[in-house]
């Protein structure tokens, strides 16, 4: 049986793995086996955190809306219910942006929602 030299193929695969873990510390960015383990862990974390980011932003929007709505003596759940019943097509992201950037517009949205029901 002839000898198979895998230098080019193996080097290409190793370099691809080492490129993924370029910012890691110590052996995780220099040696292939620890780098491969680190790359798998990194990809798993990034997959998990993409979904986590959506959850975190929703929490942030709810907190901002709640803080603004409390100034008008209305609870968060009541405000969302009123806005949905008045058929306003505003999601939590838009409401949070309006609450932070333009408080008077948010006030008019809330009063319109209260008086339309």
UniProtKB/Swiss-Prot annotation:
Entry annotated with the keyword Ion transport: no
PROSITE patterns with a match to the protein in the record: RIBOSOMAL_L20 (PS00937)
GO cellular component, one term: ribosome
Gene3D superfamilies: 6.10.160.10, Ribosomal protein L20 (1.10.1900.20)
SUPFAM superfamilies cross-referenced by the UniProt entry: Ribosomal protein L20
Protein location: Plastid, Chloroplast
Gene Ontology MF terms: rRNA binding; structural constituent of ribosome
GO biological process, alphabetically ordered: ribosomal large subunit assembly; translation
Cysteine disulfide partners in this protein: none
Major site of localization recorded for this protein: plastid
Keywords: Chloroplast, Plastid, Ribonucleoprotein, Ribosomal protein, RNA-binding, rRNA-binding
Similarity section: Belongs to the bacterial ribosomal protein bL20 family.
UniProt-listed PANTHER family: 39S RIBOSOMAL PROTEIN L20
UniProt cross-references to HAMAP family, sorted A to Z: Ribosomal_bL20 (MF_00382)
Biological role: Binds directly to 23S ribosomal RNA and is necessary for the in vitro assembly process of the 50S ribosomal subunit. It is not involved in the protein synthesizing functions of that subunit.
Official protein name in the record: Large ribosomal subunit protein bL20c
Organism taxonomic ancestry: Eukaryota, Viridiplantae, Streptophyta, Zygnematophyceae, Zygnematophycidae
């Amino acid at each position: 049986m002839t000898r198979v030299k895998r230098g080019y193929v193996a080097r290409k695969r190793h370099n691809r793995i080492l490129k993924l873990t370029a910012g890691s510390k110590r052996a995780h960015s220099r040696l292939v086996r620890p780098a491969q383990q680190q790359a798998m862990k990194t990809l798993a974390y990034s997959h998990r955190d993409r979904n986590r980011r959506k959850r975190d932003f929703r929490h942030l929007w709810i907190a901002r809306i709640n803080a603004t709505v409390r100034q008008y003596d209305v609870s968060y759940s009541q405000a969302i219910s009123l806005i949905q019943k008045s058929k306003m097509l505003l999601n939590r992201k838009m409401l949070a942006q309006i609450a932070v950037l333009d408080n008077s517009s948010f006030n008019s949205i809330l009063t319109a929602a209260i008086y339309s029901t």
